Swiss-Prot record:
Gene: PRB4
Record carries keyword Signal: yes
Organism the protein comes from: Homo sapiens
Entry PTM: N-glycosylated. Proteolytically cleaved at the tripeptide Xaa-Pro-Gln, where Xaa in the P(3) position is mostly lysine. The endoprotease may be of microbial origin. Pyroglutamate formation found on at least Gln-46, Gln-48, Gln-67, Gln-88; Gln-90; Gln-193; Gln-288 Gln-214 and Gln-295, preferentially in diabetic, and head and neck cancer patients.
Sequence repeats: 35-55, 56-76, 77-97, 98-118, 119-139, 140-160, 161-181, 182-202, 203-223, 224-234
Cleaved signal peptide residues: 1-16
Residues carrying covalently attached carbohydrate according to the record: N66, N87, N108, N150, N171, N192, N213, N234
InterPro entries given in the database record: Pro-rich
Subcellular location: Secreted
UniProt-annotated stretches for the region 9.5 X 21 AA tandem repeats of K-P-[EQ]-[GR]-[PR]-[PR]-P-Q-G-G-N-Q-[PS]-[QH]-[RG]-[PT]-P-P-[PH]-P-G: 35-234
Ranges where the record places region Disordered: 14-310
Name this protein carries in UniProt: Basic salivary proline-rich protein 4
SMART domains: Pro-rich (SM01412)
Pfam families on file: Pro-rich (PF15240)
Amino acid sequence: MLLILLSVALLALSSAESSSEDVSQEESLFLISGKPEGRRPQGGNQPQRPPPPPGKPQGPPPQGGNQSQGPPPPPGKPEGRPPQGGNQSQGPPPHPGKPERPPPQGGNQSQGPPPHPGKPESRPPQGGHQSQGPPPTPGKPEGPPPQGGNQSQGTPPPPGKPEGRPPQGGNQSQGPPPHPGKPERPPPQGGNQSHRPPPPPGKPERPPPQGGNQSQGPPPHPGKPEGPPPQEGNKSRSARSPPGKPQGPPQQEGNKPQGPPPPGKPQGPPPAGGNPQQPQAPPAGKPQGPPPPPQGGRPPRPAQGQQPPQ
């Protein structure tokens, strides 16, 4: 359609200019005087429809090619103004009182009519290589899109509702500071020597990890603190458990991650890892039989504060 309209407009340039100007002036006089008459076809290869009668506001017919602007509507009866001709035709503007989106414009055409006051509408995109969408409505903040690169910084969560931060990729990434009142754990930065801070009292939430050489488990639910999951790496130290529900940190062994222990059952700290995996000690308050023989030849050490195996 665009190519056809452009070609017709270029062919009708020489003959359409003079005749279309004369016809448009005569039609404007007819409409203003209150006697609407049928429009004569303007010069070129694109005839036009007759104008709508007064009293019934309708959109004017589209104008094509390089023809001049149509006549204005009569006073006292608002109608949408016809678009000014560029190299392409354009549909009619929306009716007053019923806001609708005007049709998009393409190419080198002029801008369509603005939306009616009192009822905001999105403006139609202007043709060319620079199109812009409608601005977001105030009162509903939206998060900016993530920025990529080697030094990206995530956006802070909205106040009042702390949530986990999205993972940040890159070699030098730094998360935003937590909001006062509801402390959150800052995410550890990647490397081979990571140190996980102790969880603050209240509602601790753990943000997802940042890119590096180690993996980190999902954050625990607020109100139910759990032991932190193990970290991969050569030298990892586990965090201290929050006050109120003592739990032992999970078993750490080399480069083999292991899931966190279940909440609600206090356990002593299992032996720290070598390469052979050792069984966990029985929970306090529930004495059990002797543990199974260890794997790898190292005998298991009894946990602190628990009864020795009978």
